[in-house]
Every structure is written in structure tokens, then in C-alpha cells.
Amino acid sequence: MSALNLTVRVHPVVLFQVVDAFERRNADSHRVIGTLLGSVDKGVVEVTNCFCVPHKEHDDQVEAELSYALDMYDLNRKVNSNESVVGWWATGNDVTNHSSVIHEYYARECNNPVHLTVDTSLQGGRMGLRAYVCIQLGVPGGKSGCMFTPIPVELTSYEPETFGLKLLQKTVGVSPAHRPKTVPPMLDLAQISEASTKLQSLLDLILKYVDDVIAHKVTPDNAVGRQLLDLIHSVPHMTHEQFTQMFNANVRNLLLVITLSQLIKTQLQLNEKLTFLPAA
């Protein structure tokens, strides 16, 4: 498959690690680079992890601690053998003159490595994210070179990552003086209530869009229409009594799980207190 047909999907933990490495950089370092880890399947490069590689950039050369990069990769393979080198990342918004030199090293480590740039300066109030592949250029018997060509990049996340991001969003907009250091997970019933409220607001938004299309206030979008049709077909057909019975059964199961978890928590707390009691 051609490198130009690749699509890059980046998980949130990768961006957090890039920002953390940028914040911990040396005072004389203007750019931070590192290795991207993940997997490649059917033209999709999924980046699930990364680590920083110490380096120094001079006018005519780049000094990188390659032994450190190999050690970090070997340690990561012991924890997660499914993650392989898929490319490299760098902070900044542009490809520099040293990028081709660094890319040559990663081209020896994997096939069709991708280059990810993360704009940590937050130009425009957003963290710019771009992905590139290096295409070889030249004529037979003449000089050859390479050109970094952009490819599609998007953010993706697993369900636990999505849950963690939602918890982090609760601190957005809070002043640093009142911002909590930790955000405890919500109780199960509170999560159901919040999810139901969000679902209701989304349904109201969909109904408003449909009403506006019927009233010719909004130009219909065929893609949105197909997605709404797929959504309707995904809803199981059942009567009101069947839905009520299913809902009540799920609520009873949830309440039972909450009760048992609270009993276990109380028992553990009691056991901890009894353990530290002085012997009579």
C-alpha cells in the first residue's frame, strides 16, 4: 500500500506525553522529538504510545541518544508487545531542515514511518496536529531527495480514555485557585442521570434539525440523513411494556451492584480499622 493512502489515528495519551516532554525540556531546547509506538492495520496507523528521545540540533547535524531510544523501546516491548515503532513526533508547527535526517533513522526502524508534529505554542487557541509521510523524489542516475507530504490525521480514544477525558473537562473553566487537584469518579446513578440529560439534549438538537429541514430553513445534508437513518434502524423494535420491563430489570441489577460494592467497601474499611487496633 502506498504511504500516501495511510491514515493516522492518535490517542489522547500520546498528546499528554508530548506536552509533558515539552514542559520538561532543557532550557536551551527549542524542539522536542520522540518515537511513536502503535500498530498498522489496513492502511490505518494507530498511535497508542510514545516516548521522548533526547537530542541536540546544530546547524549541520543532529545528535540523538539512539541507545536511550533503543532501551526505552525494549522496556516498552516487555510491557506491551503489540506496540511497535510506527514513526516519530516533534513539537512545532512546521517541518524543519533536520526532519529529513531524523526521518532517515526511523525509516530503518519501520516501513513507511509517519511524522507527527504537535504545535505546543497553541497558535489560534488550539493544539495543531499534523501528520506527514516522506516521499522519495529524483530521477534515475541523478540527485535524489525527499518531500514531506501531509496525510489525514484524526483523534481517537478507547472507552476508558473517553471517560478520563470527561473527568478532566470538569476542571475546564475553573480558576486555578479553586481548581481541585483530583476529580473523583461519579457515582453510577449520577453517571446515568448525566448521560440521560446529555442524550435528551442531543435528541432535542436532532429534532430541531429535522424540523428546520422540513420547514426549508436549513439545506438538507445527505450524509446527516443517512446517519439518522442508520441510527433509527439500530434502535431495537419493542413495545412500551417490553421497554419498561427491560429498563426496570437493568435498574434493579445496577442497584444490586451498587449495594454489594458499598458493602465490600464498608467491610474493607472496618477490617482496616480492626487491623490497627492494639492487642488487648
Swiss-Prot record:
<dbReference type="GO" id="GO:0061059">
    <property type="term" value="P:positive regulation of peptidoglycan recognition protein signaling pathway"/>
</dbReference>
<dbReference type="GO" id="GO:0003743">
    <property type="term" value="F:translation initiation factor activity"/>
</dbReference>
<dbReference type="Pfam" id="PF13012">
    <property type="entry name" value="MitMem_reg"/>
</dbReference>
<keyword id="KW-0396">Initiation factor</keyword>
<comment type="similarity">
    <text>Belongs to the eIF-3 subunit F family.</text>
</comment>
<dbReference type="GO" id="GO:0050829">
    <property type="term" value="P:defense response to Gram-negative bacterium"/>
</dbReference>
<feature type="domain" description="MPN">
    <location>
        <begin position="8"/>
        <end position="138"/>
    </location>
</feature>
<dbReference type="InterPro" id="IPR037518">
    <property type="entry name" value="MPN"/>
</dbReference>
<dbReference type="GO" id="GO:0033290">
    <property type="term" value="C:eukaryotic 48S preinitiation complex"/>
</dbReference>
<dbReference type="GO" id="GO:0001732">
    <property type="term" value="P:formation of cytoplasmic translation initiation complex"/>
</dbReference>
<dbReference type="GO" id="GO:0140367">
    <property type="term" value="P:antibacterial innate immune response"/>
</dbReference>
<dbReference type="GO" id="GO:0071541">
    <property type="term" value="C:eukaryotic translation initiation factor 3 complex, eIF3m"/>
</dbReference>
<dbReference type="GO" id="GO:0045747">
    <property type="term" value="P:positive regulation of Notch signaling pathway"/>
</dbReference>
<comment type="subunit">
    <text>Component of the eukaryotic translation initiation factor 3 (eIF-3) complex. The eIF-3 complex interacts with pix.</text>
</comment>
<keyword id="KW-0963">Cytoplasm</keyword>
<dbReference type="InterPro" id="IPR000555">
    <property type="entry name" value="JAMM/MPN+_dom"/>
</dbReference>
<dbReference type="GO" id="GO:0140492">
    <property type="term" value="F:metal-dependent deubiquitinase activity"/>
</dbReference>
<dbReference type="GO" id="GO:0016282">
    <property type="term" value="C:eukaryotic 43S preinitiation complex"/>
</dbReference>
<dbReference type="GO" id="GO:0031369">
    <property type="term" value="F:translation initiation factor binding"/>
</dbReference>
<keyword id="KW-0648">Protein biosynthesis</keyword>
<dbReference type="InterPro" id="IPR027531">
    <property type="entry name" value="eIF3f"/>
</dbReference>
<protein>
    <recommendedName>
        <fullName>Eukaryotic translation initiation factor 3 subunit F-1</fullName>
    </recommendedName>
</protein>
<dbReference type="Pfam" id="PF01398">
    <property type="entry name" value="JAB"/>
</dbReference>
<comment type="function">
    <text>Component of the eukaryotic translation initiation factor 3 (eIF-3) complex, which is involved in protein synthesis of a specialized repertoire of mRNAs and, together with other initiation factors, stimulates binding of mRNA and methionyl-tRNAi to the 40S ribosome. The eIF-3 complex specifically targets and initiates translation of a subset of mRNAs involved in cell proliferation.</text>
</comment>
<dbReference type="InterPro" id="IPR024969">
    <property type="entry name" value="EIF3F/CSN6-like_C"/>
</dbReference>
